[in-house]
Amino acid sequence: MAGLKNTSYNAVHWSQLAPEEQIRFWEDYEAGRATTFLVEPERKRTKRRRGEHSTKPKCENPSWYRPERYKALKGQLGHAYNRLVKKDPVTGEQSLRMRMSRHPFYVQKRTFVGRKYAFRPEKQRLLDAIWPVLVSFSDAGTHTVGMSVTRLAEEISPKDSEGHVIPELEVTVSRLSRLLAEQVRFGVLGVSEETMWDREHRQRLPRYVWITPAGWQMLGVDMVKLHEQQQKRLRESEIRQQLIREGVLREDEDISVHAARKRWYLQRSQDALKKRREKAAASKRANRLKKLPVDQQIYEMAEYLRKRLPPDEAYFCSDDHLKRLAIRELRQLELTLAAPPPH
């Protein structure tokens, strides 16, 4: 067909059109408005336009290694971490030994998760950096990473000399959440089955991930030894002892990995709810106290603390000591007294 021009990949031949559209096509062809037998579909009218803002991430090259003060990982968890990270015997500098983003597993399962191409360079670097964190904080019994997605993003973000995250270079929670969700689709990570809804704060409770057998196989660990160490840790776990005390399990019964994970996540959810309630109550108390004079703030806080003290401690607590406690509590509420507390 001479005179055909390059068209979009989703163009169709005129014979595949509906009868009414075929008649309209031949009318345009005879009038000279159509120069090809391939017809592009009509685009939807939209006001969306490509912005001029930068789409590159804040932290383009994240990295994380276990600090020297951390104890060395034992068993197959330590073997997995050592396969990921190597340490220079002379300088003591740590670097990546294996880049997980280049593992053949991701190439084999690429189409299964809906990907056509390999990871982009910035995603590769984030994926390489997050795996040492996942292995380092993974529980030996449940293989659950003991940090929420928000805490993981904070852990992997660059920090200043005081240990605070640099806002301009942070790894955002949304970016890491998208990466972990894709790893769940690959099957190398699992995610907590239930995400409870916090009605008061109108947001969900933290989510946690755990490393699946496919993920451990990618790391090259001995699966038999890993399973033995996992069962041993579960038998010694506090969760199993708690279930035995509650009468749910007998002394000779073992707890399953799924039940241990579910129980662990329930405890974390309850802790998060308790912490949020305490934070909300402290915020309301601070908003009420900041409208009062400084002396009244100290008096109100002292009375509040007096009611919360145990009876024996409240009996021997002097007014000066209670005042110091009140000033310290006000400082924690950031209601602030410029002068240091009395000694």
Swiss-Prot record:
Residues 42-61 are annotated as: Disordered. InterPro entries: Plasmid_replication_init_RepA. One of its GO terms (biological process) is plasmid maintenance. Binds specifically to the motif 5'-AANCYGCAA-3' (repA box) in the origin of replication. Acts preferentially in cis; binding to the repA boxes is sequential, with the boxes closest to the DnaA binding site being occupied first. It is involved in promoting open complex formation by unwinding the oriB at sequence 5'-TCTTAA-3'. It comes from the Bacteria. NCBIfam families: RepA_IncFII_LM. Keywords: DNA replication, DNA-binding, Plasmid. This is Replication initiation protein. GO terms for molecular function: DNA binding.
